[in-house]
Amino acid sequence: MTTDTHTLHIEEILDLLPHRFPFLLVDRVLDFEEGKFLRAVKNVSFNEPFFQGHFPGKPIFPGVLILEAMAQATGILAFKSRGKLEPGELYYFAGIDEARFKRPVVPGDQMIMEVEFVKERRGLTRFTGVAKVDGEIVCTATMMCARSKPATAVVIKSEVTKSEGTKSEVGKPDVKES
């Protein structure tokens, strides 16, 4: 673990997180220290797909997505602190406590997420998070995340036999070890 602080650009974020458009909610990491804290930014654009329905005529960034953006920031901090995931592993958002929303986030806002490592116990890592716009707090929460072991893949068969024209075991899981 190093004590350097630095930024991460979108290419590095894409290398660390499995999320992609429209669910990647971290545009840039402004600063971090491994095992300590991370500051990231989400530029909120009117073109976000959820603004069509949340809410027509008065677009507001959904609160659950503010929490998801902070959770993605914790994932980046965890990966930079503990190493990247192995094939088959995932980093799950495992819980949230004391979430509070202070004011709406709207198109044109630049949301800064600040997350801090609190502790790790029994495979769960606890973080605190604060989201701000123009220095004003918009959301606070305590989040828990868990790094999974490589999972067993479940493949659903969806074959149709050509000779009989009937479905063979459609929808039945075929479990394979990964």
UniProtKB/Swiss-Prot annotation:
<dbReference type="GO" id="GO:0009245">
    <property type="term" value="P:lipid A biosynthetic process"/>
</dbReference>
<dbReference type="Pfam" id="PF07977">
    <property type="entry name" value="FabA"/>
</dbReference>
<keyword id="KW-0456">Lyase</keyword>
<dbReference type="InterPro" id="IPR010084">
    <property type="entry name" value="FabZ"/>
</dbReference>
<protein>
    <recommendedName>
        <fullName>3-hydroxyacyl-[acyl-carrier-protein] dehydratase FabZ</fullName>
        <ecNumber>4.2.1.59</ecNumber>
    </recommendedName>
</protein>
<keyword id="KW-0963">Cytoplasm</keyword>
<feature type="active site">
    <location>
        <position position="54"/>
    </location>
</feature>
<keyword id="KW-0444">Lipid biosynthesis</keyword>
<dbReference type="InterPro" id="IPR029069">
    <property type="entry name" value="HotDog_dom_sf"/>
</dbReference>
<dbReference type="GO" id="GO:0019171">
    <property type="term" value="F:(3R)-hydroxyacyl-[acyl-carrier-protein] dehydratase activity"/>
</dbReference>
<dbReference type="InterPro" id="IPR013114">
    <property type="entry name" value="FabA_FabZ"/>
</dbReference>
<comment type="similarity">
    <text>Belongs to the thioester dehydratase family. FabZ subfamily.</text>
</comment>
<dbReference type="GO" id="GO:0006633">
    <property type="term" value="P:fatty acid biosynthetic process"/>
</dbReference>
<keyword id="KW-0443">Lipid metabolism</keyword>
<keyword id="KW-0441">Lipid A biosynthesis</keyword>
<comment type="function">
    <text>Involved in unsaturated fatty acids biosynthesis. Catalyzes the dehydration of short chain beta-hydroxyacyl-ACPs and long chain saturated and unsaturated beta-hydroxyacyl-ACPs.</text>
</comment>
<dbReference type="GO" id="GO:0016020">
    <property type="term" value="C:membrane"/>
</dbReference>
<dbReference type="GO" id="GO:0005737">
    <property type="term" value="C:cytoplasm"/>
</dbReference>
